């Protein structure tokens, strides 16, 4: 029997999508990219956001809202086995992302606890005493991973347990209610901290570097590759999540307006968080008597976890306890952001198993959580952060772009021929009409730009393998490519595999047993 979907409110839909989108991709990823490329990053980021990422968001929202189906149900129906494979690729890619994303959320949980103690005054306590990372670059073999970090492991398990409790309530009772609390709190805290850190002595030094624009950097292909990956990642497109939430949203809503609100909101959070980080780096650099902020920290997934605790330690030296209070607020905010995004990532798989393979929600949730949690153990060793790049390049810079490219080609006259139907639905309900010019952008310009960046990402990956980079050659290939494709194949052909298994071992079905 087909399961009936319950609607969520317009506000619930908007906050759920924004929660899935903003996450740690905006709060951790965006400041890191700005730290690497400075002000030059904003130009390709905005170009990609407007020409490629937002149009994909339009389409995903429109499909989910019009057809009231998740990505797997819809593409399996219009595209057969090829469509099913394409749709499951969304879920397997994003569930892989959740395996190391959950560890980062676990880091925030530990920092919340540290913020209640005097260890915050040590500044780098988490980075040196908890994370205990001895190699933040490349690792040559699995032995280089170091020791299993039990505190990180327990925090990660805690994150999965909290996530399971929220997801048990489903889209309506669990996800919508959680995001109605988390997202407004997130916005409020980010705005307060951005204003406060701007008043710190030395903040101007950081902001000058943040908005420094080197025109030559725009000729760097790596800049454009990073910008494209970041824009898709920050909007949560190509993960399946948008279809799911849109299918539960009120019918005939203005998807174009909602997409612009989400894009503006997530970009605003990313920029405000970056201002907080650069204000903090400037203040720390001045406190250390340094004029070049590059001498203070190294870029990477742990950037915020290096910067923010040191800032609050400095504040505590000036105004006792204030640093602890601000640290608690910041890391609770970061935890909410991470959880809201992690919810969407795992729901993409759970929803597919529930509605397409017809498992009970508890069964689908148990399979998804236990499987992802088992893989996440790999990222709880002392030097595991060095593994992140091997997966991140496939998730954010290759798979998400491949899915976006196939979607844009798929709705064209050369694929499933959906563009005119979606255009009619949008134009009936939206203030912004899909014109002939917009059709050229969606079906020609955007796919070409995305394809160029896919090629750049794959080229970089191959170069790293040629250079014998262990992370790319092992974790990147086995998890980023092998595991994703294997899971996608199994989920696409699960009925055929089940039938073949029964025939091979001569197992009779209930019907055959009478």
Spans of features found by a protein language model:
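Membrane-interface "cap" regions at the ends of multi-pass membrane proteins
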Residues: 1-28, 56-61, 65-78, 84-88, ...
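Hydrophobic alpha-helical segments and their helix-loop junctions in multi-pass secondary transporters
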Residues: 56, 101-128, 187-211, 279, ...
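Extracellular loop-to-transmembrane helix junctions
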Residues: 34-59, 151, 400, 477-486
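Inter-helical loop and helix-membrane interface segments of multi-pass membrane transporters/permeases
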Residues: 4-5, 33-36, 71-89, 103-172, ...
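Membrane-embedded translocation segments of transport machinery
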Residues: 2-7, 11, 176, 180-343, ...
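C-terminal membrane-solvent junction of multi-pass transporters and transport-like membrane proteins
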Residues: 89-93, 357-369, 394, 398-477, ...
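Transmembrane helix-loop junctions in multi-pass membrane proteins
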Residues: 24-39, 163-174, 195-208, 216-221, ...
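Transmembrane helix-boundary motif of multi-pass solute transporters/channels
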Residues: 9-46, 205, 241-249, 258-260, ...
